[in-house]
From Swiss-Prot:
Pfam families: Ribosomal_L35Ae. One of its GO terms (cellular component) is cytosolic large ribosomal subunit. The keyword Membrane does not apply. Belongs to the eukaryotic ribosomal protein eL33 family. One of its GO terms (biological process) is translation. GO terms for molecular function: mRNA binding; structural constituent of ribosome. Keywords: Ribonucleoprotein, Ribosomal protein. This is Large ribosomal subunit protein eL33z.
C-alpha cells in the first residue's frame, strides 16, 4: 500500500482575524489584528514576530488551475497584553475575512 502512513502533521498554527487596526473613528486596513491560538501573553507573541501568515480563500474563477487563492503576510508586533498580534499583508485583507482563519507558519525561524 503506497501513500502517507501515520498521522497528519500540521506545520502551522491557526489564527483568527479580529479586524483592522483602528481608533475610535478611523480604521487602518493596511494593518490587521490576529489572535493566534494558544497565545495569551505579550511574551509568547515575541516568538511569532516575523513569522509568515497566509489567508486562504476560495474564488469563483480558476487561476493557475485552482479555485483557492492566498494573501501572504507577516507578523509585525504585539497588540496589547493578551496575545493579539499586528500583521501586514501584501494586499489589504478583504472585509469578508473578519472572523476567518489564517495560517501562522513556523518560519522564518529565529532560533
Amino acid at each position: 500500500m503506497k501513500g502517507r502512513q501515520g498521522e497528519r502533521v500540521r506545520l502551522y498554527v491557526r489564527g483568527t482575524v479580529l479586524g483592522y487596526k483602528r481608533s475610535k473613528s478611523n480604521q487602518y486596513p493596511n494593518t490587521s489584528l490576529i489572535q493566534i491560538e494558544g497565545v495569551n501573553t505579550q511574551e509568547e507573541v515575541n516568538w511569532y514576530k516575523g513569522k509568515r501568515l497566509a489567508y486562504i480563500y476560495k474564488a469563483k474563477t480558476k487561476k493557475n488551475g485552482s479555485h483557492y487563492r492566498c494573501i501572504w503576510g507577516k507578523v509585525t508586533r504585539p497588540h496589547g497584553n493578551s496575545g493579539v498580534v499586528r500583521s501586514k499583508f501584501t494586499s489589504n485583507l478583504p472585509p469578508k475575512s473578519m472572523g476567518a482563519r489564517v495560517r501562522v507558519f513556523m518560519y522564518p525561524s529565529n532560533i
